[in-house]
Amino acid sequence: MSKLTKRQKTVGDKIDSNKLYALSDALGLVKEFAVAKFDESIDVAVQLGIDAKKSDQVVRGAVVLPNGTGKTKRVAVFAQGAKAEEAKAAGADIVGMDDLAADIKAGKMDFDVVIASPDAMRIVGTLGQILGPRGLMPNPKVGTVTPDVATAVRNAKAGQVQFRVDKAGIVHGTIGRRSFDTAKLQGNLAALVDALIKAKPATSKGVYLKKVAVSSTMGVGVRVDTQSIAA
């Protein structure tokens, strides 16, 4: 059996994998052991009390994190005329229609979010096989297909994140960076949990927020007492 490294022993001494920590304490531990040479992301995994195999229990949506994500997102918008001008004024990085679609088909995808006005979906629909697998396909359920493209752009720039439950009933998300103070991370997680609660399927029975754990990109995971997450 291989010997534990000094860091692994320190983590093992300080973090009890069976304990539920108050959110502030959990985040403090995650930040303490996030020792990579870059500003690690602080991530969360939420186990929901749903049956992800049932179509009426798929949890999906978007939420603007009050303290941002620590990453500046580049936003592309499919719009024309007045809507295109509104998108540019709101801070969109790329705005177009057929020209933007041609760039995407050519492999030019220097953006993190794609937004479309409803009338542009005739063009965007042809890009499903390219945008879909990358999680970039606009969808009205998360506010990225909308006549109000300006608000959608501002939300994306302000730190909006999309969430969707996976096949195991878990929602994964990023709530900030190691450099964020604990209060900002707490506020972001509370906003995400509030959005998940609002998206609870009517057919979901029993305990909805079953397990919550926080971690960093290269670091340890710490379980959180759900009662300590104040929305």
Curated annotation (Swiss-Prot):
One of its GO terms (molecular function) is structural constituent of ribosome. GO terms for biological process: regulation of translation; translation. GO terms for cellular component: cytosolic large ribosomal subunit. Keywords: Repressor, Ribonucleoprotein, Ribosomal protein, RNA-binding, rRNA-binding, Translation regulation, tRNA-binding. InterPro entries: Ribosom_uL1_bac-type, Ribosomal_uL1, Ribosomal_uL1-like, Ribosomal_uL1/biogenesis, Ribosomal_uL1_3-a/b-sand, Ribosomal_uL1_CS. Part of the 50S ribosomal subunit. HAMAP family: Ribosomal_uL1_B (MF_01318_B). Belongs to the universal ribosomal protein uL1 family. PANTHER family: 54S RIBOSOMAL PROTEIN L1, MITOCHONDRIAL, LARGE RIBOSOMAL SUBUNIT PROTEIN UL1M. Binds directly to 23S rRNA. The L1 stalk is quite mobile in the ribosome, and is involved in E site tRNA release. Protein L1 is also a translational repressor protein, it controls the translation of the L11 operon by binding to its mRNA. This is Large ribosomal subunit protein uL1. It comes from Polaromonas naphthalenivorans (strain CJ2). The lineage of its organism: Bacteria, Pseudomonadati, Pseudomonadota, Betaproteobacteria, Burkholderiales. The gene is rplA.
